[in-house]
Curated annotation (Swiss-Prot):
It comes from Caenorhabditis elegans. Its EC number is 2.3.2.27. Signal peptide: none annotated. Pathway: Protein modification; protein ubiquitination. The gene is brc-1. This is Breast cancer type 1 susceptibility protein homolog. Keywords: Cell cycle, Chromosome, Cytoplasm, DNA damage, DNA repair, Metal-binding, Nucleus, Repeat, Transferase, Zinc, Zinc-finger. The lineage of its organism: Eukaryota, Metazoa, Ecdysozoa, Nematoda, Chromadorea. The keyword Metal-binding applies. Residues 140-173 are annotated as: Disordered. One of its GO terms (molecular function) is ubiquitin protein ligase activity. Residues 415-477, 505-603 form the BRCT domain. Disruption phenotype: Animals are viable. However, there is defective double strand break repair. During the early stages of meiosis, this is characterized by impaired homologous recombination in germ cells with increased apoptosis and increased numbers of rad-51-positive foci. Increased sensitivity to UV and IR irradiation and topoisomerase inhibitor camptothecin compared to wild-type. Following either IR irradiation or camptothecin treatment, there is reduced egg hatching. It is found in: Nucleus; Chromosome; Cytoplasm.
């Protein structure tokens, strides 16, 4: 009977394996036949075609065609008969006497399928714990056993405490007592819990016996060092509780000598040490020192701020005084100390003479200061931007130069920024040599569009050297070694483009001109098309979004040399009859602040030459 049941189970298992979908791995639901003659669920194959246009069979990896997939009547009937067979098999199991003895709530616990939905409690956020008819056997967790105490301590009886007799004791007995401690140490190191020693065992330990044994081996160490060698943690313990030990043993702390604390130290120069004279208190009051007499000869310096000068006078007089008593100590001052003190006193004198109290100032002086402050606030502050340093060898020197200039001149009248913006007034070309630059940068173009003053690097150096913000007239950029493919007429002049931009205060270079700058035409690895749009807008140009139904007059469609749309540039030029130029025409026009001829910048010729 068991063999028949086993064969039936194997046959049903093979049938179930053959009727399983290769995508969802469950029994077919509405099966269809694919072009590779494999069968899948209709919902599974439709979901695959919705996610991908090109679907491969998960079994043979061949490309499937959705239109060629068709229904299979035979497979559909086979699946239905299989489901009926499983339903009948379930009913037969329910009718068997073996399962009738089980309560209905535990009849299908092995399959984890509820007999009735009402058994699951409602409004419960989690599933009930499974209750099996045959419970699992409890499994014990493996835990490390507690280490057993050493057998030597268990077998050896406690010995009474005897007075120490180091001379008569045999070293063999000491070794027998040391061995259990070494064994205990090894057991404690391998155990997982701290080993606890009883109080009786601690009483039986003779520390002097161990100390004497250590001193016999090495006579250089004393008893305290031997104790620390025997118990290393004792050193830190005694150090932390040194005060309590002194109280327990009634040891008085050492007294501090108060004589050095009461001694006064006066500083004097080497010349004063030669003429040093010890005076009494009465003599010091009758004859004041020489520095006080010198200060008393010029009282007019301290008329305005008497309180401040009294304080500074006292501090200034205390240093050169050489009056000393029996407890005084005279220390020779370092060279130049007296000179530094005189300089400090001179600085205090200048500060007090230049600043007076409001009560002593005249209304005219107050009004002059207010006018000066209003004049400073009314002026436009200088906002300085420095170009990037492209030379690695000069980068460190340039950064130090910028740091010195920043810390020296940062104020309300002089500010700094990282990029050129609407508040920028000056651009410093860090790669300049004298009043000439080798190439033009993006910051240079932004400075021309913002009508900024462009100066060379030497301006920073001279400002730091003199300590003043010098005029920019002698440090402006007047030439550039890089050339453009267009010759500028002599009638226009040879001045730089930033000078033309500043002379045209209210005008715009591209006023009344329209530009079509599309991303697909202006892709450039060295220059972002968004920066190009921003430069054109700052120069007064109008940016268009499409180029249909537009007048070709003053219309420019911009391409990049790196663009591959050469055919489209030809079609646009033939269709709309407008100027189709490269972005270099825009950049060179801004750098020279002129509307340059477009013939050398034709996009058709430039793109073709680059691709060739």
């Amino acid at each position: 009977m068991a063999d028949v049941a086993l064969r039936i189970t194997e046959t049903v298992a093979r049938l179930q394996k053959e009727l399983k979908c290769g995508i969802c791995c469950s029994t077919y639901k509405d099966p269809i036949l694919s072009t590779c003659f494999h069968i899948f669920c209709r919902s599974c194959i439709n979901a695959c075609f919705e996610r991908k246009r090109k679907v491969q069979c998960p079994i043979c990896r061949s490309v499937l065609d959705k239109r060629s997939c068709r229904d299979t009547y035979q497979i559909t009937m086979a699946v239905q008969n299989y489901l009926k067979l499983s339903e009948a098999f379930k009913k037969d199991i329910e009718n068997m006497n073996t399962f009738k003895s089980l309560p209905p709530e535990k009849m299908f616990m092995e399959s984890q399928m509820p007999l009735d939905i009402t058994i699951i409690p409602e409004n419960d956020g989690k599933r009930c714990a499974p209750d099996f008819a045959i419970p699992f056997l409890p499994v014990r967790r493996k835990r490390p056993s507690r280490p057993q105490p050493p057998s030597a301590f268990a077998e050896e009886p406690a010995e009474p405490v005897e007075p120490p007799e180091p001379a008569t004791k045999q070293p063999v007995e000491l070794q027998s007592r040391v061995f259990p401690l070494e064994k205990l140490k090894k057991d404690v190191e391998t155990s997982t819990e701290t080993y606890k020693i009883s109080r009786e065992e601690l009483k039986n330990v003779d520390i002097e016996e161990y100390i004497n044994t250590l001193r016999e081996n090495s006579t250089e160490i004393d008893e305290i060092d031997a104790l620390f060698q025997l118990m290393p943690t004792m050193r830190q313990f005694l150090r932390n509780n040194i005060n309590q030990l002194m109280e327990k043993f009634h040891v008085a702390p050492p007294k501090k000598s108060e004589k050095p604390a009461n001694r006064r130290v006066s500083f004097a120069s080497s010349q004063d040490l030669e003429n040093i004279k010890i005076m009494t208190a009465s003599e010091s009051l009758e004859t004041p020192p020489e520095p006080i007499q010198k200060l008393a000869q010029k009282p007019e310096v301290f008329k305005s701020t008497q309180n401040l000068i009294d304080l500074n006078l006292n501090t200034a007089v205390k240093k050169p005084v050489v009056v000393a008593s029996d407890d005084d100590e005279v220390v020779e001052d370092s060279e130049g100390e007296l000179q530094i003190d005189e300089d400090d006193l001179a600085n205090v004198t200048c500060a007090t003479s230049s600043t007076t109290l409001d009560a002593d100032r005249t209304p005219k002086a107050i009004q002059d200061d207010e006018d000066r402050i209003d004049d400073e606030l009314s002026q436009v502050p200088k906002t300085i931007v420095c170009s990037r340093i492209h030379n690695d060898a000069d980068e460190v020197v340039g950064l130090e130069l910028l740091s010195d200039f920043y810390h020296k001149f940062l104020s309300n009248a002089c500010r700094f920024a990282e990029d050129v913006n609407e508040h920028t007034t000056h651009l410093v070309m860090m790669n300049s040599e004298g009043r000439s630059i080798s190439q033009k940068s993006t910051a240079y173009l932004y400075a021309i569009a913002r009508k900024c003053v462009i100066v060379g690097r030497q301006w920073l150096v001279d400002c730091i050297t003199t300590g003043l913000l010098l005029s920019e007239a002698d440090y402006t950029i007047t030439s550039c070694s890089s050339t453009i493919p267009v010759k500028i007429p002599p009638s226009i002049g040879s001045e730089m483009g930033w000078l033309r931009s500043r002379n045209d205060e209210h005008g715009k270079l591209f006023a009344g001109r329209r530009f079509m700058i599309l991303r697909k035409f202006t892709m450039n690895p060295y220059f972002d098309y968004k920066q190009l749009i921003e430069l054109v807008q700052q120069c007064g140009g109008e940016i268009l979004s499409c180029y249909e139904n537009l007048s070709p007059e003053k219309l420019y469609i911009i391409f990049s040399k790196h663009s591959k749309a050469i055919e489209e540039s030809k079609n646009i030029e033939n269709l709309y009859k407008c100027d189709v130029v490269t972005m270099e025409w825009v950049l060179d026009s801004i750098s020279e602040y002129l509307i340059l001829p477009t013939q050398p910048y034709k996009a058709v010729d430039s793109i073709g030459c680059l691709q060739d």
